[in-house]
Amino acid sequence: MAFFSKFLNIKSTEMRIAEKSLKRINDLEKYVINNTDEELRSKTQFFKDLLKEGYKLEDIRDEVFAVAREATKRVLGKRPYDVQILGGILLDLGSVAEMKTGEGKTITSIAPVYLNALSGKGAIVSTVNEYLTERDAQEMGQVFNYLGLSVGINKAQMDPNLKRYAYSCDITYSVHSELGFDYLRDNMVSDMSEKVQRELNFCLIDEVDSILIDEAKTPLIISGGEANDSSSYYSADQFVRTLNNDDFLVDEESKAVTLTASGIEKANSFFRIDDLYNIEHSEKVHLIQNALRAHKVFKIDVEYIVKNNKIELVDAFTGRIMEGRSYSEGLQQAIQAKEMVEIEPETQTLATITYQNFFRMFNKLCGMTGTGKTEEQEFIDIYNMRVNVVPTNKPIAREDAPDLIFATAKDKWEAVGKEVERLYQKGQPVLVGTAQIEDSEIIHRILIEKNVPHTVLNAKQDKALEAEIIAQAGVKGAVTIATNMAGRGTDIKPSKEALELGGLYVLGTDKAESRRIDNQLRGRSGRQGDVGISRFYISLEDQLIMRFANFEAFQEVYAKDAGKEITNKQLRFAFNNAQKKIEGFNYDSRKSVLNYDDVIRQQRDLIYSQRDLLLISNEFEEIIRRMIKVFVKNLVAIEDHKLKSGAYDYQKLVDFLNKNIAVYIKHDFNVDEFKRIHDNELVDKVNQMVNDIYNQWLANAIEKTDQAYIDNFKKQVLLKTLDDNWKKHINKMDKLRSNVNLVQYSQKNPYQIYTDEGTKMFEDLIQTIAFESVLKVFSSPLGEKSLITAEIKNDPLYQQVASTFEYNPYLSISEQEKQLLERYNNVKQRLNEVEQQNLQEQSYKDPASDNLENNPEPKTGSQSQSEHEMVLTPDTVIDPSIDTNQWFEEINIDDFINVTKKDSELESKEKEQEEVKNQETQPKENKPAETKVDATKNQENVSEELKAKEVATVVEEKPKKVSKAKSEKLKVAKKVKPKDLESKEKPKSDKAKKSLAKKETQKPKKPKITSEVKIAKVEKTNKKAKAQDKPKAKVTKAKETKPKTEVKADKVKTKTAKTSEAKAQKVEAENFVNKIVFPKNKIDLKLEKIKLK
């Protein structure tokens, strides 16, 4: 049909629909122009409401396009032409709109993008580079913002949050490659919230032929590096440098290189092996093949450049650097060895997709180009898009002159130099287009010799200068040398003087592999009806004729015409045929890439859908049990378990299970378990056994943690197992794809072999994922029986210790349980010791207070216990209205340990003071001998004076000042009396009162814990402050009854003994601290059943 349409001028269905719609839009324009800005903006919400009511996009298309045209005129000052509206309608119909260069494709895109963004599902505009992405988003974004729609820009190396925002906008502008990479990365995340893309709804591709045709052969690959020995690449590179032209053969058409017999012999000698093509040397053959291609096929400044000591690939169609791209399968490393730059690790494919399969996932796909009609059949076959040619707004005035052909490249370059020099002297601007960077360097040197000022634009220049260089290419006297990247997507506007001199002259120096590329270069001139001229200079030594025509025969025939132009029509026909031949070859190559990718596409879709299910599902229990069923079925199905008769050998089965899986599922199988079981019931029996083991695993896991933790654990196991095995599967498929062509020699279809083998490999992948997932779950320590019993977990002390425990994510749950249990036991043991000390203290009775039991002193207002005061005992019930956090907010664990450690010391000192006091109350006899102290006496017989002196000495060792704040707390603490003394406070007589008052000045008090007093600091301050006041009277008394020499000796002895005792207590306290590690910050110790003294 397309063939007859070309000659009969039959319009396509899309074109007929578009022309009718254009008439209705023009009729609506006279009503829309009367709307105010506010009314025009409100149309957006009006259209959205219509869609919610059930209207379809095609139902509101005419009015939406009329509104978009008016908004464009008001914001940009440019009213879209009818041909631009016509092109926009064709785009909305899902076809390719071919619009000649300079016809305003960017403005054409506004209306269809606006219409499809109204659905709220997002509209994406794909461009060929980041410069056009930013330019179009900024310029066209003004119109969309005016109409109330948001616009986002997506670029490489952006933060994921910024990418997520860009995709969430109503309209997103992005480079085409980044769209594919974001899709692959989204299917590698561990949580749905990490994804950046949303539904692939609508995509408009600018320069659609460049993306869907020219770059379709190169798949998008996300790879990870693997550390390889770089010496192997250098070794292969050195060998290739020793070869002569007779040692290898090069196929120019397929760019394949093979060793001849002499080359193989040299390889055997160089690597000191017997047979290069022995299976054990297959890796070496692979290295040599890559080194040969790097040296004999891939050329610097053609396929790649060296920039900043790195290999940068060059796009053969645009001349631009393909940033972030590299060759796979070791070819990149071979080129790096050739150019003597740093060899990067060879990569392993982690995820891959082709442009064809990615863009076919959009609900609606359309595109614009200046040259797409020649590839219409490919657009129809692969993308189901028809190419419709949009008429120009003004007739084309450019002259396309016939090609000039020369016998040699030297003659061609001389003719190009003379023509450029002539045009420069005339003042007519000229754009010299080259197919390769190498060619642009040649003409650059020629023009330097001729003293012609010029500008060079190729992949070696900064991209930021591209727009500026192209903008100046149309002024009078401008000479610009550029690769095929020149002006792609940009506008060259000739000056008024240049138009008077004939407009822009486009001079091509080589025929491209596709007629589309040549037409794109011609289209730089003659935009919007401007005058201009285009012409190609070609030779019989150009790459096109050498690869796809019988150029040797042509060279022999036309050798006599060296130095002059060849005007043979048959030769021009040969060039055109060579272009068609290479176009067909490239189409077959793209079709083959798509066919092979279609095989893995089905597998990829299934894996990615299952992966998304894991990310959003909570039914991990069901998934695991299904995998157990697959796991058991595969185990039992192994043929080694069967006898020759076909019946199962249960002993072999049990031996196999115990050898391969018992260590993972923590269960030893016994042949007795399988007695009286029919072969048909074997799978169900083993499945039941494994499920019972799993149920026990699950019960143990729940005892250790909660269901949410278990679900997350299963999720991570399943995701990691799926991802790891999918990566391995992709690499296996890549190797299969590389080697499958060898089956052609056995008269087999490579594609069919790839499909069959790939299907088997995928089935193995599913089984492997299930097998490994089940074993990983069973082998996890999470299912082991918990070390911490339910009784311990219910203990408030354990709950307090657990709340302050810092979990280490790098340790297993069992190891963390051991640490937590050890800490709990240490804390419990220590607190039990403290409680025992408190009980012993309560059992001690003061002799002086025995007479006070029957007449307790009534409590005063300051002494009575307030509603916020509380003594913590094992039976205490805490009022929930009391802020217990305030009690302990300043407690330091060091204070807690010091207080508990010194309790016994303080008790002994109190006892000694009581004995001293009792001695003082008895009548004294003036016997000097009684004041002397025998140094050899046991400590039990030391006199009361010496004990008093010891107390005074200990107190005087480390005098400490009490701050004002602590003194205030001390005053409050003094008002609080121990509970066991409250019933003994009122003496029966004045003498008893005086005795008690004297005792109170000597004996340190232990305050009760209140909400106003921080117990650790109060106890410490109370004891130290009172210790400073106690010794004064005693020191004086000792001086009166003891000689100085004896007192001095006693001081030395007492100090030495106390120092040793203090050191021992310090060591004991440090050991305890080392066992119990608490956070350094202040903690809330809710000790509900412990009394602290």
Swiss-Prot record:
Basic and acidic residues compositional bias, start-end: 904-937, 944-971, 978-1062
Recorded catalytic activity of this chain's protein: ATP + H2O + cellular proteinSide 1 = ADP + phosphate + cellular proteinSide 2
EC top class named in words: translocase
Keywords on record: ATP-binding, Cell membrane, Cytoplasm, Membrane, Nucleotide-binding, Protein transport, Translocase, Translocation, Transport
Residues annotated as binding ATP: 84, 102-106, 491
Subcellular location per the Swiss-Prot or TrEMBL entry: Cell membrane; Cytoplasm
Protein's membrane topology: Peripheral membrane protein
Annotated spans, Disordered: 837-869, 904-1062
Pfam families the record matches: P-loop_SecA, SecA_DEAD, SecA_PP_bind, SecA_SW
Domain of life per record: Bacteria
Keyword set includes S-adenosyl-L-methionine: no
InterPro entries assigned: Helicase_ATP-bd, Helicase_C-like, P-loop_NTPase, SecA, SecA_DEAD, SecA_motor_DEAD, SecA_preprotein_X-link_dom, SecA_SF2_C
EC number: 7.4.2.8
Annotated GO CC locations: cell envelope Sec protein transport complex; cytosol; plasma membrane
GO aspect biological process, one term: protein targeting
GO molecular function, one term: ATP binding
Function: Part of the Sec protein translocase complex. Interacts with the SecYEG preprotein conducting channel. Has a central role in coupling the hydrolysis of ATP to the transfer of proteins into and across the cell membrane, serving as an ATP-driven molecular motor driving the stepwise translocation of polypeptide chains across the membrane.
Complex formation: Monomer and homodimer. Part of the essential Sec protein translocation apparatus which comprises SecA, SecYEG and auxiliary proteins SecDF. Other proteins may also be involved.
Family of the protein in this entry: Belongs to the SecA family.
Identification of the protein by name: Protein translocase subunit SecA
Originating species: Mycoplasmopsis synoviae (strain 53)
